[in-house]
């Protein structure tokens, strides 16, 4: 180095701790000759950019802009590479692409199809070199200018360190596969059985080659990297369609394996999804009829009393009864049809047009009242009916509580207000419990 007076500022890299002041960024362009001398020795190259740390932000986006006029002259012009400074600054992306291409060798285009193909094409030119030497050579070739050296050299050191760390963790080709690849290759036996035999052969040839089934795509910035990492079916068991398009994995595996590392939950999800569909189709096709109407106790009591009065309802009677019981007319009509069918089975040859009276068939509500004296006509007063209804009512209810219901059920020939008003008055006068309140 020169020790003359004008060149004293050029000795700043040799000083022990150069202060990185705010104005030290634009300072290096002045001593261009001394910078050229320091560029001749590669050993001092990492020391020089320490004084110019602020220009690092500019070097992220502008690839190689030399700060001095003679700063880029000693180095050869940069040879065209397929990556930019942003690729160097992304260690995971750069490391995974380089390692996958170096490990798999000549079959790079077929294996790296999900990634950008240009990133893997430039590597086989120097396939004879070791991964670390290739990494350092790329970093040095990209660091022709001082600004590019400031952005690339520390990152390249970190790149090589991360590559060594990845090899120590077991991600190299010799020691074995990554834990993700191990877990992916073990579990999906059931899915592999469903694949074609030639696909299984392709899988068997691909696994021993580098053992990095889920390694190359994991951590890379490719579009389909997430799908390839998450779905072992696309990564190992289906190499054929993988070369068609970058982001075109199989729909079932992508849907089920979106966020899971292992493939055991994926296999369960893949197998259970058709089961869910089959269950839904069975419930629709196997059970087309809807659920039966669940009648409450007071609705059954009122319907039975109405059936004892008459087995056939007119339109007005059916409407009034449906309104009083909070049912639809269809529900009332169907209940009466079923009740008539049951009554005909229990009383063969009986006159269906005559009112049933007190001697109705032993249905759910008419059985206990069959032997009571007197065939009760539809217009009978409610007190005589309280006794037969109390026999089949709940044990806790008093004898007069169903009597209020019978008033409305046993007066079918009155007008609509007359049918509803005895029901309301009866339930309030006789002190019916709150159990009947919703139907008032």
From Swiss-Prot:
Residues 1-13, 62-74, 145-158, 237-269 have a biased composition (Low complexity). The keyword Ligase does not apply. It is found in: Nucleus. Induction: Autoregulated by a negative-feedback mechanism in the ventral midbrain and a positive-feedback mechanism in the midbrain-hindbrain boundary region and the eyes. Residues 170-181 have a biased composition (Polar residues). Residues 288-347 bind DNA. CDD domains: homeodomain. Disruption phenotype: Homozygous knockout mice for Sax2 exhibit growth retardation starting immediately after birth and leading to premature death within the first 3 weeks postnatal. Mice do not exhibit any obvious abnormal behavior or motor skills. All mice show normal suckling behavior, but at 2 or 3 days prior to their death, they become lethargic and show signs of wasting. The few homozygous animals surviving to adulthood are fertile, but all the offspring from homozygous intermatings die within 4 days postnatally. Residues 182-198 have a biased composition (Acidic residues). Residues 210-222, 356-374 have a biased composition (Gly residues). One of its GO terms (biological process) is lipid metabolic process. GO terms for molecular function: DNA binding; DNA-binding transcription factor activity, RNA polymerase II-specific. InterPro entries: HD, HD_metazoa, Homeobox_CS, Homeobox_NK-like, Homeodomain-like_sf. Residues 14-31 have a biased composition (Pro residues). Residues 1-82, 145-291, 342-387 are annotated as: Disordered. Keywords: DNA-binding, Homeobox, Nucleus. One of its GO terms (cellular component) is nucleus. The keyword ATP-binding does not apply. Belongs to the NK-1 homeobox family. May be required for the coordinated crosstalk of factors involved in the maintenance of energy homeostasis, possibly by regulating the transcription of specific factors involved in energy balance. This is NK1 transcription factor-related protein 1. It comes from Mus musculus. The lineage of its organism: Eukaryota, Metazoa, Chordata, Craniata, Vertebrata. The gene is Nkx1-1.
